[in-house]
A protein has these predicted regions:
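Acidic, histidine-bearing metal-coordination/catalytic regions of metal-dependent phosphoesterases
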Residues: 2, 11-160, 181, 401, ...
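Extended active-site neighborhood of metal-dependent phosphoesterases/phosphodiesterases
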Residues: 115-121, 129-145, 203-300, 327, ...
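An acidic-aromatic substrate-binding cleft motif
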Residues: 139-192, 197-198
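Alpha/beta-hydrolase fold active-site loops
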Residues: 155-157, 187-188, 263, 270-271, ...
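Active-site neighborhood of phospho(di)ester-bond hydrolases with catalytic His/Asp-centered motifs
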Residues: 160-162, 188-194, 221-227, 276-277, ...
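The substrate-binding groove and active-site-proximal loops of carbohydrate-active enzymes
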Residues: 161-167, 192-204, 233-234, 275-285, ...
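Non-catalytic positions within long, well-ordered alpha-helices that form the structural scaffold/packing
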Residues: 180-182, 297, 333
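Active-site-proximal segments of metal-dependent phosphoesterases and phosphodiesterases across multiple
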Residues: 299-342
Length: 462
């Protein structure tokens, strides 16, 4: 036995030596090889198999649910199946088939044309979990799950992210995935514009959908358009909303005429979420302002959030969205909007209107609005509070060169907010508490990364 073990050991040592001796030769051979980038035209080419599946809402969040997806142009029977979720596979026999209500062909910058389809599930039951899949009757996606909203004001949570825009698959994917990991019960995601860099670049939309993956098919999206969702800007006016926008996002058409699926509102369990298009100016912005006043005046919800791309108070040096601020801020203050969620400036800041003599300001017990600018992608700009300071606003927390995501939880009279860095560190946070009369008190979150850094700076000076 000892001889056998010794012999085996000898052979092992000899084999190891041979392998080690072979390594340099293998490395030389590998070094001579050159990798070739796989073409985007092949990576993102559509097929009969559904992809880019995404949930959104066109109507009542308690009784409807929209889903959009992409195939090649040869699919002529786009459809979806839906059933109340069960613990076993028997639900499939009970699934109802719904034919797509719309299909649109889109030809972007790649040498192929794709077809986008939309189904709007209707007459659903509130507070109910459903399973669905999309396809053509033969080629199907996997089964996805979603839950309808309650028809009452019950607790819920959602995610908010700023610009993804550049190097989306490489750098943004971890952010959106970590966000969901931190808030797996999120009911929707607000995207504050510039989801991509070039509105008609199919490979960029392909990266965006791939980064979110199955999450898009289970959690509804509420997107607002940024300047990069437009083909170009001519004399301050956008020209050509991305041809992908409406085919792939099925959104409410309750906004002013001419702003279908870019200016709209959605009600969810006691909160009204409003999307505005700040890419337009002049009379086109005036139309939105008139519509916005009606939507705010006739608002039965306890909470109100507005999202648009260009900030009321700019973070970036040299930027100043004067018309947006002059036309929107009076209504925001008049109707005590709770949160204004923005993007565009590729840094983070959170603040409020500076204390006024009357006490009507965002940090008093009577007034309210918290303004946030954030970024989730890798494109970064410098930060300055100059535009905030010069226009009667105060920055509470700010950071540059950092990707972030935001978690918002709503429970009755309390809204809590967290801004976390890409790796999950708590950078900023606050809580809004409302009294029955509508007055608000804002409590800053303690023990954040921002607080720790400020304390370290203070200690270093001492």
């Amino acid at each position: 036995m000892k001889k056998i073990l010794k012999s085996s050991k000898s052979r092992t040592i000899l084999l190891s030596a041979l392998l080690i001796g072979a390594v340099p030769t293998m490395n030389v051979a590998l070094a001579d090889l050159t990798a070739t980038k796989y073409p985007a035209a092949e990576t993102y080419k559509p097929t009969p198999i559904p992809d880019r599946i995404i949930l959104s809402w066109k109507g009542d969040t308690a009784t409807t649910q929209a889903v959009s997806w992409r195939t090649d142009v040869n699919v002529v029977t786009p459809q979806a199946q839906i059933a109340v979720a069960e613990d076993g596979p028997a639900f499939k026999a009970k699934a109802k088939t719904v034919m797509a209500e719309s299909s649109s062909e889109v030809k972007g910058n790649q040498p192929y044309t794709a077809k986008f389809h939309t189904v709007n599930f209707e007459n659903l039951n509130p507070s109910t979990k459903y399973l669905y899949r999309v396809g053509d009757g033969v080629n199907w996606s996997e089964w996805f799950e979603f839950s309808t909203a309650s028809d009452k004001s019950e607790p819920f949570s959602f995610l908010y992210v700023g610009d993804a825009q550049n190097d989306i698959l490489e750098h943004w994917s971890r952010v959106i995935r970590n966000a969901y990991s931190d808030l797996p019960d999120a009911k929707f995601i607000i995207h504050a514009g510039d989801l991509i860099n070039h509105g008609d670049a199919d490979e960029q939309w392909g990266e965006w959908f791939k980064a979110g993956g199955w999450l898009n098919g289970m959690v509804s999206s509420i997107p607002t358009p940024g300047n990069h969702e437009y083909s170009k800007i001519v004399k301050g006016e956008p020209s050509g909303l991305s041809q992908y926008w409406r085919p792939q996002f099925a959104l409410p058409e309750n906004g002013p005429t001419g702003f279908e699926e870019t200016v709209y509102y959605t009600d969810y369990q006691g909160m009204r979420i409003i999307s505005l298009d700040t890419n337009v100016k002049g009379s086109n912005l005036d139309k939105q302002v008139a519509w916005l006043e009606q939507v705010l005046e006739n608002n039965p919800n306890k909470w109100t959030v507005i999202t648009f791309h260009h900030p009321i108070y700019a973070n970036s040096p040299g930027r100043d969205n004067v018309e947006v601020r002059n036309k929107l801020l009076p209504l925001i203050e008049k109707y005590s909007v709770d949160l204004v969620l923005q993007g565009h400036d590729h840094s983070y800041a959170r603040g409020h209107v500076t204390n006024k003599a009357s006490g009507q300001n965002a940090m008093s017990t009577k007034s309210d609005t918290v303004f946030v600018v954030s970024v989730s992608g890798p494109k970064m700009y410098d930060f300055t509070s100059k535009n905030w300071d010069e226009n009667g606003a105060q920055v509470r927390n700010a950071i540059k060169d950092t990707q972030l995501y935001q978690l918002v939880r709503v429970n009755g009279d309390t809204l809590s907010y967290e801004a976390r860095t890409a790796t999950g560190n708590l950078f900023d946070g606050f809580e809004i508490n409302k009294t029955p009369s509508g007055q608000k008190q804002i409590k800053e979150t303690t023990n954040t990364q921002w607080e720790k850094e400020k304390q370290e700076e203070k200690n270093a000076k001492n």
